[in-house]
């Protein structure tokens, strides 16, 4: 392997993890599996909900799982690198082999897992779902982001004019979705997933895909625009992601709602980001504090959005949490304080979906708004797509 340049990243102490794994008797598991098991065990300790309950499902969110095993010589079998094997090992520890599901959908994995868990409960598959998300730093992941020239050697600065890339992080988090309310409950009142099919690694240049996800999530939650207290956006501090998000929020008429990114605090944690950032949003709703976006000084996105570098005390009702990722995927959820149930505001003036681009396929050519953007030499091209 080649040496990587010095970069800023948020890492988990290997020494501390080893100590906790030894105490829990899970040293034989991979590092990723250890983090998942320790995190889920802590959730079980706090909530009292165990996976011995057959009405409780388990969703694991990750982008790469045990991918670090590809570049390390370990005693683990070759199949350990596959997501299904990682899930089998983790679920086996909790005796929940028949109730484990893996969500791996790039950087929206965590938010997608929450939406999936919500739908499973609504469709009567489970009464409760433990949703855990995690990813590790590895040579594979770091070199991949380096190839896109999207990493920064300094603390990331989402939405700032001087942003120059993201910081990676490793983390694991877990939440319990349940039909049973507790005094500390936050309601997952809406959720949606979309895909703009723009590029394998680049976000949409218009923001319409993320806008569709936001609009559908808000429609499901039934909350009016004026009752959204803040937006926790993906905010990676790459040029194109932050530009796209500003356009999407404007399309959704959320351009006046306080917006922030949590990436400067613990980096971009990939499959864990949607989970741990949602946990932070829950605490913000309860405490009435919107965390600042460190490093933000000068607006640097085409559509102005209110971003603050310092913490703000604001009245809380609902928040929108978004994520976007490779392959054009987008996801959004609405988190709500329980006292604002049933979330059906009378003045529900959500923006309507409108056609932003006209796509036409003629012979073997693709036109967008009457402009030729692709031509294939394959005579049956139109049939295949």
Task: Map each language-model feature to its residues.
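Conserved small-residue
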Residues: 40, 58, 110, 117, ...
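Cysteine-centered functional microenvironments
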Residues: 25-26, 71-74, 97-115, 156-171, ...
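Conserved active-site "lid/cap" helical segment
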Residues: 3-60, 213-225, 252, 359-385
